[in-house]
């Protein structure tokens, strides 16, 4: 086992050659004042302990060579990490080299740390321009940046701080320029009066910002009194003039009144145009359109066209006579220069007629229901056709057979033919149907029978024959009933 003891006496000079047992492998490691001996056998350790009578010697027994290598590596690591330097003697040349190296390190550390300068030296350095021949050393600038705080001792500021300082300087400059401009706008008499009111102030001293603002307020109030503006008080104290939006509106109204006498032609034109627009809008609001005016003047229902009587909500069946009267009236309106003719599309004689069609209301309703499928619904257009003269109609009417007369009586209820009549020859329609229809319809309208209640309508026999013929020729319809009342 190894024994560890400390003694103040210095260690003796040991010589490995004095070992009496040269066959035993031993290693000596100076470790301060303690000497460690590694031996491989117990007998060798006993012999070494007998010959070395030193209390500062440590004997370590190692069983094999592998353990010996591990112990040596551990001892080497402890000697490298320990802060205690070895106390061996060095030659004179080696010690001189070490001293020189230490002095060089101290000089470098002194040059890297900037020395404090007095204020006079700093001012001189700022006033003196830099020499052109000076060359900046990058290693020195890096060392200067590494020490000290930014903004002190001539070091650069961060970018954000520099921008903030520049904005603040710009703001202060703008405020000062604004106050200087305000002082220039105020008359000298007002500024001299304010300077005279200042107690203990020199005449050459500039007015402060607060005094400048007060002077501007008083000057504005004096201008208001001079112009005759009488502003209502904004609070209970009853100030002579107010400020803010109310005072601005009063000033605007007053100046608008002054500018009315100096309007140019363009402004007058714009005002006249606005007045006309306002008058038209007011008239439209005072006279709203009636419900009857909003109704269409011409409508189509189940293939039959109806025209509205002006000023009423009733519709009248459009016939050939009405078409002729309308075309004649349109020609008169085109030729008339004064424009004082009647603009009503319906003649008075048609309005006075007790029946709008030569067929009774019941029969006309049945005919409309039957022609619902074959006629085109909601066809808002007037079909204009050319008709032959009355002489041809009278001659052709004498030649027609009784069956053709029944067809003519049936067709008198509608000026528009159903769809299946398009398949008939054109000559039959032009030469037979239309002339007879026109003659009979004109005769019925011209009859003046005040005692007869069925004036202007067909007889019962002719009506029954017309219905029978219509049922035989018209296709059947399953459409629902429709109301013609408006």
Swiss-Prot record:
Annotated organism of origin: Drosophila melanogaster (Fruit fly)
Phylogenetic placement of the source organism: Eukaryota, Metazoa, Ecdysozoa, Arthropoda, Hexapoda
Region (Disordered): 1-26, 75-158
Functional summary from the UniProt entry: Involved in the determination of the neuronal precursors of optic lobes in the central nervous system.
Superkingdom of the source species: Eukaryota
BP-aspect Gene Ontology terms: central nervous system development; chaeta development; chaeta morphogenesis; epithelial cell proliferation involved in Malpighian tubule morphogenesis; Malpighian tubule tip cell differentiation; negative regulation of mitotic nuclear division; nervous system development; neuroblast fate determination
Residues annotated as signal peptide: none
Gene3D superfamilies: Helix-loop-helix DNA-binding domain
Subunit structure: Efficient DNA binding requires dimerization with another bHLH protein.
Name the UniProt record assigns to this protein: Achaete-scute complex protein T8
Keywords: Developmental protein, Differentiation, DNA-binding, Neurogenesis
Biased composition (Polar residues): 75-86
Gene Ontology molecular function, alphabetical: DNA binding; DNA-binding transcription factor activity, RNA polymerase II-specific; protein heterodimerization activity; protein homodimerization activity
GO CC list: nucleus; RNA polymerase II transcription regulator complex
């Amino acid at each position: 086992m190894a024994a560890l003891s400390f003694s103040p006496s210095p260690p003796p000079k040991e010589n490995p050659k004095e070992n009496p047992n040269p066959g035993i492998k031993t290693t000596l490691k100076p470790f301060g004042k303690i000497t460690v001996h590694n031996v491989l056998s117990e007998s060798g350790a006993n012999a070494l302990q007998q010959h070395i009578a030193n209390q500062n010697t440590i004997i370590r027994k190692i069983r094999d060579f592998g353990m010996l290598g591990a112990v040596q590596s551990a001892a080497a690591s402890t000697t490298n990490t320990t802060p205690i330097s070895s106390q061996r003697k060095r030659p004179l040349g080696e010690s001189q080299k070490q001293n020189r190296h230490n002095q060089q390190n101290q000089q470098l550390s002194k040059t890297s740390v900037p020395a404090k300068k007095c204020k006079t030296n700093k001012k001189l350095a700022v006033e003196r321009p830099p020499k052109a021949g000076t060359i900046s050393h990058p290693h020195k600038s890096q060392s200067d940046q590494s020490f000290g705080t930014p903004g002190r001792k001539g070091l650069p500021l961060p970018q954000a701080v520099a921008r903030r300082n520049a904005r603040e300087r710009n703001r202060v400059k703008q405020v000062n320029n604004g106050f200087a401009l305000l002082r220039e706008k105020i008359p000298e008499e007002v500024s001299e009066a304010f300077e005279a009111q200042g107690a203990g102030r020199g005449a050459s001293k500039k007015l402060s910002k607060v005094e400048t603002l007060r002077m501007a307020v008083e000057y504005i109030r004096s201008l208001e009194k001079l112009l005759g503006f009488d502003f209502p008080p904004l609070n209970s104290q009853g100030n002579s003039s107010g400020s803010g939006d109310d005072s601005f509106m009063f000033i605007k109204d007053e100046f608008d009144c002054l500018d009315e006498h100096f309007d140019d032609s363009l402004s007058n034109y714009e005002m006249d145009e606005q007045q006309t627009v306002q008058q038209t809008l007011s008239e439209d609001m005072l006279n709203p359109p009636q419900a009857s005016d909003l109704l269409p003047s011409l409508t189509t229902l189940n293939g039959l066209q109806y025209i509205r009587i002006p000023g009423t909500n009733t519709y009248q069946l459009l016939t050939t006579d009405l078409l002729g009267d309308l075309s004649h009236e349109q020609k008169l309106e085109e030729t008339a220069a004064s424009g004082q003719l009647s603009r009503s599309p319906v003649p008075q004689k048609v309005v006075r007629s007790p029946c709008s069609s030569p067929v009774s209301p019941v029969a006309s309703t049945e005919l409309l229901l039957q022609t619902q499928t074959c006629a085109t619904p909601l066809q808002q257009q007037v079909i204009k056709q050319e008709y032959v003269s009355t002489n041809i109609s009278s001659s052709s009417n004498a030649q027609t057979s009784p069956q053709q007369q029944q067809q003519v009586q049936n067709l008198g209820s509608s000026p528009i033919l159903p769809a299946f009549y398009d398949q008939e020859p054109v000559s039959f329609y032009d030469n037979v149907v239309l002339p007879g229809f026109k003659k009979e319809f004109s005769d019925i309208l011209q009859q003046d029978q005040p005692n007869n209640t069925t004036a202007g309508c067909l007889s019962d026999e002719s009506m029954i024959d017309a219905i029978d013929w219509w049922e035989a020729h018209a296709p059947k319809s399953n459409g629902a009933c429709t109301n013609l009342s408006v």
